[in-house]
Curated annotation (Swiss-Prot):
Belongs to the XseA family. Bidirectionally degrades single-stranded DNA into large acid-insoluble oligonucleotides, which are then degraded further into small acid-soluble oligonucleotides. It comes from Salmonella paratyphi B (strain ATCC BAA-1250 / SPB7). Its main location: cytoplasm. InterPro entries: Exonuc_VII_L (IPR003753), Exonuc_VII_lsu_C (IPR020579), OB-fold_nuc-bd_dom (IPR025824). The gene is xseA. One of its GO terms (biological process) is DNA catabolic process. Its EC number is 3.1.11.6. It is found in: Cytoplasm. One of its GO terms (cellular component) is exodeoxyribonuclease VII complex. It catalyses: Exonucleolytic cleavage in either 5'- to 3'- or 3'- to 5'-direction to yield nucleoside 5'-phosphates. This is Exodeoxyribonuclease 7 large subunit.
């Protein structure tokens, strides 16, 4: 008996591992609601706490990379909604959950319902792109399902009036918040389908909390939108608000104003497009007419060019050109011959000796004249220099000094007598006067004082 069961015997490690795998594979990720107790946060940054209700509790861990996304600080005794994976801590065999996200219990329950309905409808194919209806372009009538007193309706009408004032708008007023709102929204959708007045529907409201927007997360509303034959544009809340209606609708707009922009044409832009098209059409017509006109003119000219009179005129013109060319050629030949004759005559005249003799005689006459002028200039210059020298010599000549009453005496040996010591009594000296010489004997010598 024992031997037949040995193949089913688990070790403790294998048992814990098997149980962990079963928990993780079979349970997967779940939402758990409970009260926090024994909350701790060691230096690692992970959270460890116990989640309990009136009759049971379970150990929980939330690692740092997950708890950093939690927007509040968990408190002891706080009711929370936790999205977690079920697992087993193998070394101790402790069953525990690993939390991935955490929300306060009130809003968290709504989020849980939202996720569950989203998964359900997605599995049924309500979000598939193949079911989306294209929006009409352009829309001829717009239906609006929203509160008749809300800001969303005001924004939608304001945009439609600005962009396309002539576009008809039908309002299906409903509550957009509260217990009665989902039913009213469904009836408004069904009424719009039954009446068939509009070719596109805007369903939406202004922003708010998850609870405020909950009517658009209602399954009845989602299925009514899906079954609707009229294309639907959802416009719920702000751009960050995403509802089930957004997934089911044929197109999601981030805001009610944006939805109005999507379903309407901008008449000013349309007018600009028409004007631009008119301009392009006018330019195309002008180009076409100009092109045809050019083509007609070309054909007309070609026909004219084939006319016999025109061909005869062209031949006459060609003949006249030939006559002119022959005349020009003859004139050119005569001119060339004349020029050659002139060049020959010029060369012959250059070889005649008579012009060369005339040029040589003229050259000799020029040289004689220049030589005579040079001699005259040199003689005049020499006379002037000689006169200057005579004047200078006369100014320094001893004769000029004698003429003024002075005399010059010399000794018998011809030396000029300058001092008395050169002579003595009884010496003969010669004295030069202006008009002659005289000899005299020195009687006595008296030194000057």
């Amino acid at each position: 008996m024992l031997s037949s069961q040995t193949s089913s015997i688990f070790t403790v490690s294998r048992l814990n591992q098997t149980v962990r795998l079963l928990l993780e594979q079979e349970m997967g990720q779940v939402w758990i609601s409970g009260e926090i107790s024994n909350f701790t946060q060691p230096a690692s940054g992970h959270w460890y706490f116990t989640l309990k209700d009136d009759t049971a509790q379970v150990r929980c861990a939330m690692f740092r990379n997950s708890n950093r996304r939690v927007t509040f600080r968990p408190q002891h005794g706080q009711q929370v909604l936790v999205r977690a994976n079920i697992t087993l801590y193998e070394p101790r065999g402790d069953y525990q959950i690993i939390a991935e996200s955490m929300q306060p219990a009130g809003e968290g329950l709504l989020q849980q319902k939202y996720e569950q309905l989203k998964a359900k409808l997605q599995a049924e194919g309500l979000f598939d792109q193949q079911h989306k209806q294209p929006l009409p372009s352009p829309a001829h009538c717009v239906g609006v399902i929203t509160s008749k007193t809300g800001a969303a309706l005001h924004d939608i009408l304001h945009v439609l009036k600005r962009r396309d004032p002539s576009l008809p708008v039908i309002i299906y007023p409903t509550a957009v918040q509260g217990d009665d709102a989902p039913g009213q929204i469904v009836r408004a959708i069904e009424l719009a389908n039954a009446r068939g007045e509009c070719d596109v529907l805007i369903i939406g409201r202004g922003g708010g909390s998850l609870e405020d927007l909950w009517s658009f997360n209602d399954e009845r509303v989602a299925r009514a939108i899906f079954a609707n034959r009229i294309p639907v544009v959802s416009a719920v809340g702000h751009e960050t608000d995403v509802t089930i209606a957004d997934f089911v609708a044929d197109l999601r707009a981030p805001t009610p104003s944006a939805a109005a922009e999507i379903v309407s044409r901008n008449q000013q832009e349309l007018l600009r497009q028409i004007q631009s098209a008119q301009q392009r059409l006018g330019m195309a017509m002008d180009y076409y007419l100009a092109n045809r006109s050019r083509r007609f003119t070309q054909i007309f000219h070609r026909l004219q060019q084939q006319h016999p009179q025109l061909r005869l005129a062209r031949q006459q013109t060609a003949l006249e050109r030939l006559r002119q060319r022959m005349g020009f050629a003859l004139e050119a030949r005569i001119k060339q011959a004349t020029q050659r004759q002139q060049r020959v005559s010029q060369r012959l005249s250059q070889q005649n000796p008579q012009p060369r003799i005339h040029r040589a005689q003229s050259r000799i006459q020029q040289l004689e004249y220049r030589l005579t002028e040079n001699i005259r200039s040199r003689l005049s210059e020499q006379r002037e220099r000689f006169g200057n020298a005579v004047t200078h010599l006369e100014a320094v000549s001893p004769l000029a000094t004698l003429a003024r009453g002075y005399t010059v005496s010399t000794t018998t040996n011809g030396k000029v007598l300058k001092k008395i010591k050169q002579v003595k009594a009884g010496d003969i000296m010669t004295t030069r006067l202006e008009d002659g010489w005289l000899e005299s004997e020195v009687k006595s010598v008296t030194p000057g004082t």
